[in-house]
Amino acid sequence: MAKVDIHPIWYPDAKVYCDGQLIMTIGSTKPELHVDIWSGNHPFFTGSQRIIDTEGRVERFMRKYKMEKD
């Protein structure tokens, strides 16, 4: 026998907010979703991605284990 009332309530028009601004409407099990990052403000998707590597991994390893490059 199948259990009754085990599924969550589905909200077909759940609102997604980022910084208090309505971003989109989706289907969800919660009526409102508040996000910090979404594709509209993420650096990877907006093209403002910067790679910050002040110290290379090899140099860091060499310095950490006090080794010299050959």
UniProtKB/Swiss-Prot annotation:
Major location (coarse): plastid
Stored Gene3D superfamilies: Ribosomal protein L31
Source organism, top-level taxon: Eukaryota
InterPro entries assigned to the protein according to its UniProt record, in alphabetical order: Ribosomal_bL28/bL31-like_sf (IPR034704), Ribosomal_bL31 (IPR002150), Ribosomal_bL31_A (IPR027491), Ribosomal_bL31_sf (IPR042105)
Molecular-function annotations in GO: rRNA binding; structural constituent of ribosome
Keyword Chloroplast: yes
Record flagged with keyword Ribosomal protein: yes
GO biological process: translation
GO CC, any one term: chloroplast
Pfam family, one: Ribosomal_L31
Subcellular location(s) of the protein: Plastid, Chloroplast
Keyword terms: Chloroplast, Plastid, Ribonucleoprotein, Ribosomal protein, RNA-binding, rRNA-binding
SUBUNIT field: Part of the 50S ribosomal subunit.
Free-text function comment from the UniProt entry: Binds the 23S rRNA.
Family: Belongs to the bacterial ribosomal protein bL31 family. Type A subfamily.
NCBIfam families referenced in this protein's UniProt entry, alphabetically: L31, PRK00528.1
Protein name per its UniProtKB record: Large ribosomal subunit protein bL31c
Lineage: Eukaryota, Rhodophyta, Bangiophyceae, Bangiales, Bangiaceae
